[in-house]
Every structure is written in structure tokens, then in C-alpha cells.
């Protein structure tokens, strides 16, 4: 089953005080030109659920989308785009950081990276920052169609090797993804589905005395 199918827009917020009361959340984040909005639209099988722009940094707020199981997908502002006023950029950084560190409903992070340029400095900073939460991370190496099959295999292997220091201490996984070729949808569903199943199981198990 596609967890993201039929997702619908719920609300958008620009301050943590306006965060909605939700059960569980999966957040999507990435550099401003990594293909995050396209990945969300592909996973949800919706042409314009998340706005796709040729201008990086278009997502300027935290957008919530309700999934058919009642949980939520959260589209976070892209990072690394500097062509905005400093005050606006600082607000994005604080909003993003506070949400990732403080949001109790957040059970995992889907991090989108361009397969041609994975693990750039800001991506590594994001991994280091989120690592302190202990929550799982799944990386989508987007735009994989821009690489040959051999390049895809090589890139995936290299990224897995570079992630080893993180995966030794944290649940972190990575896959190839292409919005154009609809590549990797099932794998992303399985990974996120396992997070939701684990969270549901933990919530329903009796508390230890």
C-alpha cells in the first residue's frame, strides 16, 4: 500500500506556536535544489501537492499534509538558499532547527539529496544536527535518472560507506530515487511504513513499571 497516496493539504505554519495537534509525523527536508517538492509529488502521486519551482527556496513555511492513515507528512523549508534577506533566512534556520529538535510527534526524517551531488556540507550538518534526536533518517538520492546504471550503483555504495559512522549509532538508510522514472517509491514506502509500525507498537505496548 502507498502510504502517501491521497495525501491532502492540512495547514501551513510559520511559527512553532501554531503547530497543529497531530498523532505522528514524518518530515521531509533537503537542500533548496535537491528535488524535495518533486519527490513529495511523486510519492503522493499528485502533480502539485507540493509546489515545484525553478526558483530554489520556494518552500518558506512548514507545510502539513494529512495521510490516509491519519498521520502526517511535513514539508520543511529547503536549506542552503541564500538569495533572501538575512532576517528571513535566520527565521527559516531557527524554525527548522526548533521543529526538528523539539517536535515530539516527529518519528523520522526523510532527507532528499541530489544523487549527482550527495552529502554536501549542509547535508552533513543536517545529519549531525538531527543525530542528537536518535530518530531514524532515510535518504532519497533524487534525480537518479541523471546517472547511468553503473554511476547509480557506485554512488549508492559510496554514500552508504560515508554514512557508516552514523549508522553505527542511528537507524539511517539510503536509496536511489527518481521522480521522472518513478523509481524508488516502493522502497520509500516500506521504510517509512516500518517507522510508523514501530511507533504504533511502542505506543500500544504496556508501560514498564
UniProtKB/Swiss-Prot annotation:
Keyword Metal-binding: yes
GO CC annotations on file: cytosol
Keyword annotations: Cell cycle, Cell division, GTP-binding, Magnesium, Metal-binding, Nucleotide-binding, Septation
SUPFAM superfamilies registered for this protein in UniProt: P-loop containing nucleoside triphosphate hydrolases (SSF52540)
Cofactor(s) needed by this chain: Mg(2+)
Domain named EngB-type G: residues: 22-198
InterPro entries: G_ENGB_dom, GTP-bd, GTP-bd_ribosome_bio_YsxC, P-loop_NTPase
GO biological process: division septum assembly
Alphabetical list of Pfam families matching this protein: MMR_HSR1
Domain of life of the native organism: Bacteria
GO MF annotation: an example: GTP binding
UniProt binding sites for Mg(2+): 37, 59
Free-text function comment from the UniProt entry: Necessary for normal cell division and for the maintenance of normal septation.
UniProt family annotation: Belongs to the TRAFAC class TrmE-Era-EngA-EngB-Septin-like GTPase superfamily. EngB GTPase family.
Stored PANTHER family: ENGB-TYPE G DOMAIN-CONTAINING PROTEIN (PTHR11649:SF13), MSS1/TRME-RELATED GTP-BINDING PROTEIN (PTHR11649)
Protein name as catalogued: Probable GTP-binding protein EngB
Organism name: Neisseria meningitidis serogroup B (strain ATCC BAA-335 / MC58)
Source organism phylogeny: Bacteria, Pseudomonadati, Pseudomonadota, Betaproteobacteria, Neisseriales
Gene: engB
